[in-house]
């Protein structure tokens, strides 16, 4: 993914978070990924790491309409997924 794409996605996420009144940490730890698939508009995610521990993580996640997060696993890690705005569809199998 190009650095310009990463910067655009971070700006878009920041604008969304701020427009909904969510205060970001002073120096956010951003993760921007296309999951190695080369198509960040379809498969991507923008995250701010708020807490990272061996068995727990807390992240503020930003996605967009029609965006898919591919199936993945975490060995012994708890995640709470809370949709603060918009709609979230989770498929389990």
Residue ranges and their predicted role:
Residues 64-65, 76-93:
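Glycine- and acidic-residue-biased ligand/ion/polar-headgroup-sensing regions
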Residues 48-52, 59-61, 69-74, 82:
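Short histidine-centered beta-strand/loop micro-motifs
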Residues 1-56:
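A short, N-terminal "cap"/entry segment at the start of jelly-roll beta-barrel domains
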Residues 2, 15, 59, 76-78, ...:
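Context-gated lysine
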């Amino acid at each position: 993914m190009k650095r310009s794409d990463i910067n655009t996605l971070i700006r878009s996420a920041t604008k969304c978070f701020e427009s909904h009144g969510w205060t970001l940490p002073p120096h956010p730890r951003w993760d921007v990924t296309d999951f190695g698939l080369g198509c960040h508009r379809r498969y991507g995610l923008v995250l701010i790491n708020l807490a990272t521990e061996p068995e727990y993580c807390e992240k503020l996640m930003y996605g967009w309409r029609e965006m898919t997060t591919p199936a993945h696993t975490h060995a012994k890690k708890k995640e709470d997924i809370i949709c603060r705005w918009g709609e979230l569809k989770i498929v389990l199998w």
